[in-house]
Amino acid sequence: MLLLIDNYDSFTYNLYQYFCELGAEVVVKRNDELQLTDIERLAPQHLVISPGPCTPNEAGISVAAIRHFAGKLPILGVCLGHQALGQAFGAEVVRARAVMHGKTSAIRHLGVGVFRGLSDPLTVTRYHSLVLKADTLPDCFEVTAWSERDGVRDEIMGIRHRALALEGVQFHPESVLSEQGHQLLDNFLNR
């Protein structure tokens, strides 16, 4: 079973639908309706932290769940969930250089983890005004995807823990305008 923590976002059920289409059994719980002990009782095999309209500080159980379950089960953070993953390990969340609400971007990636077998560059849909500050990302993470500005690396679009099954993507793979979203999510399920 995959537990999807809903950070009160309209895209949560798009993620739910994509994971169900990939054959996953998915349980959705709001970020303020469960405690860590509730998650333990549910005994998920995967944990996904959804997008949301706030910062990780207002994302209910999200950061605490990442800290508690890191190394115990695979975790994927999407948009706000990606930011929560970084913040849980000490990275700072800051304002993005440009607000990206409903805009597509061609991003670059390393072809590892959730990006395994995906096109590079990859067109993705972005809905965010915050990002992880690159120089605060701890060494235990590698940047696996990034946007570019004038041919130079710009903002972090994907991270992966070097030792634990933890990954984050700043964009929305579940958006209809994102390329290969199903494959990215399938890569998470079948690591």
From Swiss-Prot:
Species of origin reads Serratia marcescens
For whether the record's keyword set contains Transferase, the answer is: yes
Q: Subunit structure, briefly?
A: Monomer. Heterodimer consisting of two non-identical subunits: a glutamine amidotransferase subunit (PabA) and a aminodeoxychorismate synthase subunit (PabB).
Query: What pathway is this protein said to act in by its record?
Result: Cofactor biosynthesis; tetrahydrofolate biosynthesis; 4-aminobenzoate from chorismate: step 1/2
> Which Gene3D superfamilies did the record assign?
3.40.50.880
Write out the GO MF terms: 4-amino-4-deoxychorismate synthase activity; anthranilate synthase activity
> Can you supply a Gene Ontology BP term from the record?
tetrahydrofolate biosynthetic process
Please explain the role this protein plays, according to its UniProt record.
Part of a heterodimeric complex that catalyzes the two-step biosynthesis of 4-amino-4-deoxychorismate (ADC), a precursor of p-aminobenzoate (PABA) and tetrahydrofolate. In the first step, a glutamine amidotransferase (PabA) generates ammonia as a substrate that, along with chorismate, is used in the second step, catalyzed by aminodeoxychorismate synthase (PabB) to produce ADC. PabA converts glutamine into glutamate only in the presence of stoichiometric amounts of PabB.
- Is Transmembrane a UniProt keyword of this protein? no
Catalytic activity field: chorismate + L-glutamine = 4-amino-4-deoxychorismate + L-glutamate
One GO cellular-component annotation of the UniProt record comes to:
cytosol
EC number(s) given by UniProt: 2.6.1.85
Could you identify this protein by its name? Aminodeoxychorismate synthase component 2
> Per its UniProt record, what Pfam families does this chain match?
GATase
Ordered alphabetically, the record's keywords are:
Folate biosynthesis, Glutamine amidotransferase, Transferase
